């Protein structure tokens, strides 16, 4: 059973290995502090707790997973957030990614399609004191227009194409970080919305995520 400290070392090691693709050999200090502050074992089922600090995805029920810690840290880093930001997360899952983001920004709105997971995550986040996170059960493809525009959006499930509603809900020069692709593996992308509503797309590296589900699904 690995420790929290070993997980953090593993994240830095992975960053060094993938620096060719991510463009730097280490992740932002603030991101690493957030990863250090959030107890991953609180966000996994009891039977998975011995593996909570492995640098690997873990099943959380309902056919969903909690992402590999390195990928959580990398996507958080790529969002390039500031303390005053309001962020949207699509795909709450266990609430772990939202908890990490909450350490770095003013407010996190997070959407989960599966009601059971949303309720569990909401209760967990409240119990652990993450008061700046708000959870909604909805189809994340369509975002959260009532709270838009956002300073950044993160999608933690793979979409076959870039969801236009999410682009529409970004502020100018804000980023959308998401895995893109209908099959596996997918590509982790950073999509930046420009002042003229055009987008700049940057490929980071290959990843493997569960698919984004909801009414928008392509048969």
Swiss-Prot record:
Claim: rRNA-binding is one of the keywords in the record: no
Active site location: 67
Entries under InterPro entries matching the protein: PCMT, SAM-dependent_MTases_sf
Localization annotation: Cytoplasm
GO cellular component: cytoplasm
Principal localisation: cytoplasm
UniProt key word Transferase: yes
Enzyme Commission code: 2.1.1.77
Entry-linked Pfam families: PCMT
Alphabetical GO biological process terms: methylation; protein modification process; protein repair
GO MF annotations, alphabetized: protein-L-isoaspartate (D-aspartate) O-methyltransferase activity
Residue stretches in coiled coil: none
Catalytic activity, as annotated: [protein]-L-isoaspartate + S-adenosyl-L-methionine = [protein]-L-isoaspartate alpha-methyl ester + S-adenosyl-L-homocysteine
Keywords: Cytoplasm, Methyltransferase, S-adenosyl-L-methionine, Transferase
Family according to the record: Belongs to the methyltransferase superfamily. L-isoaspartyl/D-aspartyl protein methyltransferase family.
Function: Catalyzes the methyl esterification of L-isoaspartyl residues in peptides and proteins that result from spontaneous decomposition of normal L-aspartyl and L-asparaginyl residues. It plays a role in the repair and/or degradation of damaged proteins.
PANTHER family, per database record: PROTEIN-L-ISOASPARTATE O-METHYLTRANSFERASE, PROTEIN-L-ISOASPARTATE(D-ASPARTATE) O-METHYLTRANSFERASE
Protein name: Protein-L-isoaspartate O-methyltransferase 2
